[in-house]
């Protein structure tokens, strides 16, 4: 349960500390004194976003098996969270608060009219939230797979439409019959052809000087070797030199043969063939504004695309099977959820009827209407809460429920959800008075024996029923207003009950005392 609540620099609240207790804690005050700011401060601690002033801080003491102090503050424009004085994440704080506080502010009334809120409330009551999350997961997977199939079929259609063109692109390149490596060789041959006479002259002259002509390198080496052979006997060094010269002769001869092989011998037919291929390649390069190697790479990609096209039927069948499997899984889960909703809807109607009777709506009934709808991530049900003050002529809440009826219905719906350790209600008694107000107070008093209840109210009976009472007041520091929250003594509580009854007089004070006594 909640213990101490400390609020600092929270809008008009400068420095307030409130100590809640077990039972029914009641906060009252004149209109405009910021009664709901206590709720807003707790919402701030629970992570509510907003434009909060620098230095804002809210600290809350949770009492249970162990004492936990949670804090959120704004420093340098950023929110910081703490658990027992140590820095913590927002998610850690929210996890610690989970199941501890059920906060029902005035704005929650509006949610009663929303179909998604009504659906979520029924699912929570029916303990279906986990199954609905699973359903949502399957639904999202189904939609994703359906989109994948749609995109696949669209691309398949595009491929089929341009298949002839793609095949032509491949054919016009393959008819040339040149690979990337062969293209480089072809360019080298073309370069050779363009410089054929120059190459022939250079090779011919080299062959002549190496071996074929007079005074060739080969001939000169032979003469040198023969001359040295004549004087070989005069020095051992000559034998070594003669051997080296002989080796040189052999190398020159090998060089001659190698060079002779490089003498270009290209037929006119081969020249024409090379020029024809280069001409066709040049036309392709001009046509596609790309180099031939780039065109070859693109053709390989086109081949891959065509290969994929040939296997699309298998892929399509595979995708359709996956879609059908997910659809069957979704349908099965959706049917289970729908069945459980319809079953639990009756229990919800009965439970709400019981609570409404305790709140002085003897003949009022809630009807949970469930109709089949188009599939959504929440299933195939359209859920709407219908209400009747007299047990017939059910209509949507916004059409028939008065403010007082809505307040009590909201209270009843809040209480059928999984129990929290602390319930916080803001103006839950709006629009009710007289005997009904007394019954609501009595109901909350009984509820507070099981769990802690904090309520902000204008109701005299609720104020009288409080185990601990607080009052908000507006003060001024010069021209600057600020809000204080102070605990009321027993005497002050009676005076506050009298004020809420309409006026302070001996008669109302006496009535206030009797009302307070009625709840003891």
UniProtKB/Swiss-Prot annotation:
Give the record's GO biological process terms: DNA recombination; double-strand break repair; SOS response
What positions does the entry give for ATP binding?
29-36
Matches recorded under Pfam families: AAA_23
Q: Keywords of this protein's UniProt record, alphabetized?
A: ATP-binding, DNA damage, DNA repair, Nucleotide-binding
Tell me the superkingdom of the source: Bacteria
**Which protein family is named in the record?**
Belongs to the RecN family.
Q: What protein does this entry describe? A: DNA repair protein RecN
- The species this protein was found in: Aquifex aeolicus (strain VF5)
